[in-house]
Amino acid sequence: MRSRSIPSVVHEVKRLSSEGVREFNLIAQDSSFYGRDLNDGTTLARLLKELVKIDNVKWIRLFYLYPTYFDDELLEIITKEEKICKYVDIPLQHISDSVLRRMHRRDSSQSIKKLLKKLRNTTPYITIRTTLMVGFPGETEADFKELLTFIKAVKFDNMGAFTYSAQDGT
């Protein structure tokens, strides 16, 4: 899969909004990575800056924003633009550094906690949803307890919790 160009997405949103669509959900395996594969400076924040200019667009929702590419430019546009819903779905999966490494995640517990704190401090009325996984191969009792402590401390607005199940390629 490759990211579509900003003009391509803008064209489609304009067409749909002219047909009466008012809410747009941007969904990808990792929406925060959008555009980086094009190697031309395209980012999700830059796409959003174009989409909010479309008159008939009322709401834009963002799904599956992994922490690795959730940068300050993206945070700023989410915070400032009224058309962008103050709801983010960040599938963290775990908080233990040892589990995150085994999952081949690029983020650390420290970087995740820093992002969540920044989200709450910058946009205090934001709704944060996450998905967490337990039972990943090699997860210890200490890893699990660290995850529970983290959940209690962060107080997610919505959360899905699932047990690990092997998938092809994982």
Describe each PLM feature range.
Residues 1-10:
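Canonical Radical SAM [4Fe-4S] cluster-binding loop centered on the CxxxCxxC motif
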Residues 6, 89, 161:
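ATP/adenylate-binding site constellation spanning eukaryotic-like Ser/Thr protein kinases
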Residues 18-144:
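Conserved SAM/AdoMet-binding glycine-rich loop
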